[in-house]
Amino acid sequence: RCGKSYLLFTLFKNYLIKQGVKEDHIIGVNLENRLNKSLRAPDALLQYIDSRLSSDGQYYVMLDEVQMVSEFEDVLNSFLSISNVDVFVTGSNAKFLSKDVITEFRGRGDEIHVRPLTFREVADFRDDYSQDMIREYMLYGGLPQVVLENDVNKKVSYLEQQMEHTYLRDIKERYEVRQDSDLSELVDIMASCVGGLTN
């Protein structure tokens, strides 16, 4: 929700092309896209990428939401031995926590955190700097889709949806939480105490 896919498939791809990389040497797969469902099987993904590689020049493989591939660690490890392939991946849920990735690929990759927009970035983007902008940022945060949305109801709806379908679901899956109501109540209590003294 912070723009990882846009950063990878648009900005980085355009950068590579400007550097002289041929488009057929950039292999991108959005694994969240239903059209690519068959590529979520590790062997199918390996075969698809391998069929597009040759020995001429450097290749750049971009896999978005790689945690949707079962045994994705094995898939990524398969490309480590190929000298003319660089692999870039994104992931965004409990199955793809950075500490797990660091453990699995220690010394064989770099990690880049993509965070929501800072207030300065929002202020630079918009030309209506005011106290209202500060209040709005403090209330709704800096997720790009929220910043771009003008309708308050749509902002709230989007944030509620993210909380329920992204964060809470990931916590439930990762830690096998069975009492949904207890988790929701805990989150409500913690959210109401932000910035306040707790005992």
Tell where the protein language model's regions lie, with residue ranges.
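Short glycine-rich substrate-engagement loop in P-loop NTPases that contacts/grips substrate
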Residues: 27-59
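Conserved P-loop NTPase "ATPase switch" module shared by AAA+ and STAND
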Residues: 54-72
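Structural recognition of the conserved hydrophobic beta-strand(s) that form the central parallel beta-sheet
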Residues: 62, 86-92, 113
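Interdomain hinge/linker elements that couple catalytic modules in large macromolecular machines
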Residues: 119-199
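Post-Walker A helix-loop "phosphate-sensing" segment adjacent to the P-loop in P-loop NTPases
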Residues: 13-25
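Hydrophobic positions on the alpha1 helix immediately C-terminal to the Walker A/P-loop
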Residues: 7-11
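Short regulatory helix/loop adjacent to the ATP-binding pocket of P-loop NTPases
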Residues: 78, 95-111, 125-127
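Conserved glycine(s) of the Walker
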Residues: 3-4
